[in-house]
Swiss-Prot record:
Neurotoxin that blocks voltage-independent calcium-activated potassium channels (KCNN1=SK1, KCNN2=SK2, KCNN3=SK3). The keyword Phosphoprotein does not apply. Keywords: Amidation, Calcium-activated potassium channel impairing toxin, Disulfide bond, Ion channel impairing toxin, Neurotoxin, Potassium channel impairing toxin, Secreted, Signal, Toxin. Its main location: secreted. Expressed by the venom gland. It comes from the Eukaryota. Residues 1-27 form the signal peptide. InterPro entries: Bee_toxin. Residues 40-41 are annotated as: Essential for toxin activity. This is Apamin. It comes from Apis cerana cerana (Oriental honeybee). The keyword Disulfide bond applies.
Length: 46
């Protein structure tokens, strides 16, 4: 039971962290990148 709860909480935290990093990148404004991550992503895509 405890291991299952731990697994679920780990899964949820991974989803939250991924969402936190992916969402700003998806809506990046390459003309004026708000974050360093955006700037790097914009450079990769040309």
């Amino acid at each position: 039971m405890i291991s299952m709860l731990r697994c679920i909480s780990l899964f949820l935290s991974v989803i939250l962290i991924t969402g936190y990093f992916v969402t700003p990148v998806m809506s990046c404004n390459c003309k004026a990148p708000e974050t360093a991550l955006c700037a790097r992503r914009c450079q990769q895509h040309g």
